[in-house]
Every structure is written in structure tokens, then in C-alpha cells.
Amino acid sequence: MRVSLVFLSFLFYFWANISAAIEEPSYKVISANKIYEVREYEDRIAVQTIQNNGQNGAFMKLFKYISGSNTSSTKIDMTAPVTQSVQIDMTVPVTQKFQDGEMVMQFFLPSKLKLEQAPQPLSEDLSIVVVKGGKYAVIKYTGRSTFRNFEKHSETLIEVLSLDKLKTVGPPIKATFDGPLTPFFLRRNEVMIRVE
């Protein structure tokens, strides 16, 4: 029993130090309430791919890029969150289900890298993009990063934003901050929706 407690303590210590070392995008909180907050982000650089062979395939393509599979063979620090969103025609209502349209997964590059400094991907499935800054309504939740959990919190956020008369201008974005080795009850996830 004592060995188990020591091992668990070590795991939590290790997890806390790893999580603290990962860069996250900076933002300014514009407003907050008990359910969500509105944040303002600057432009960010990301590498992205279309998820045509599942979530794990997309993740591995992006992970290979930051591990050195790029034109300069440069290893790039992992950042958080990893985001997933649906790429839709903006004439379609943004309340459509998450699985309609093509799924896009993004890794944000460290803030020290500018667009012209980002090494180009070797894979044609990847592209370097500028994610425009702006205001996002964000709801935080813990637990597994499942579609069901994401959809539940997306629906809550969309409903509350409608009640608060905040106009959304894009689909819900799933933001995952922790890896699969993090205990599910300690995992941090967010739903982000761009607002006017």
C-alpha cells in the first residue's frame, strides 16, 4: 500500500511538472461568469491536417512534424492545446453537428516562431496556417476527451451564448490540454466558439 502511495505521488508530481512546462497561447479575459468566459487571443501560427483517417492518424502526422519531419529537420516544442474543429461553409448554420464537414486538427507552434520561420512540412497532408486572433467564448470541463463529452459542453455553450445574445461566428472547437496518460479526472478540456 505504501509503495502504491509513493508511486502515485511521483506520478502526480511528474504530471504537474510536465504540464507546467508546456506553452499555452496567451489571452486576455474580457468577461467571465459561472459557465463560460470570453477571451481575446492574438494571431497564432499552427500546423494543421484534415482528419481523414481518424483522430490518431491526424495526431501522429502532426506529432511527426514537430518531431523533425519538416524541411529543416527541426524538433519543435509541443504546446497545448491540440484543437479539433469542423471545416464548414460559413453559409451553413453553426449549430450543425460537429461531425458534419471535414475535421481539422491543429498543433499550435511556440510563440517564438514567426510564420516565415516555421519549417515547412514534408507531408503534403500538413499545412502551416495563421489562426486569426479574436474573441472566443470558452467553457472548461474535465474528463475524457470524447466526442460525447465535447458535444454535451458545446450544446451548453451554444445555448447560453444564445440566451446572452452573443453572436457566434464559427463552429465549436475542441481544445485538449492533457495527454492520455493524465488521469481522466485531472484532464483539462475546453470548448471554444468565436464570437463577435
Describe each model-derived feature in a short phrase.
Residues 2-196:
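A solvent-exposed interaction/effector surface
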